[in-house]
């Protein structure tokens, strides 16, 4: 549940790898669907499963050659993955040492989902 222009922070300081199932993510990065569709010649040789995975995290957005990629939400990792690697895959970075889930949970404008795992939803 994230408003347009909002932010999702994935807080998991124990995570050190981007994807063992989809190693191509480190070459491709996470983007909206239009980013791939409108640059198909650049991405046509990647496995479609990898491309699909790279759109699932980012979600809705648009892409054109003039304005570039414009995503509905910002996705930020607060993990054990380095800042350089996080930014290289087109995600924002937050040092997990600066995250206080208890303080965030006390903020009425912030939704904290403990142990969210793979249970991410978008309401219409």
Q: PLM features: what roles do these ranges have?
A:
Residues 67-124:
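Extended hydrophobic packing segments that form well-structured cores
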Residues 1-76:
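C-terminal catalytic subdomain
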């Amino acid at each position: 549940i994230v408003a347009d222009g909002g932010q999702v922070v994935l807080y998991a300081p124990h995570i050190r790898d981007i994807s063992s199932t989809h190693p191509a993510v480190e070459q491709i990065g996470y983007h909206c669907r239009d980013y791939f569709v409108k640059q198909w010649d650049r991405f046509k040789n990647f496995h479609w499963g990898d491309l699909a995975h790279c759109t699932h995290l980012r979600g809705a957005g648009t892409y054109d050659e003039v304005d570039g990629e414009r995503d509905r939400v910002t996705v930020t990792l607060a993990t054990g993955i380095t800042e350089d690697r996080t930014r290289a895959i087109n995600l924002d970075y937050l040092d997990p040492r600066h995250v206080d889930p208890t303080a965030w949970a006390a903020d009425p404008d912030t939704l904290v989902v403990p142990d969210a795992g793979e249970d991410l939803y978008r309401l219409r």
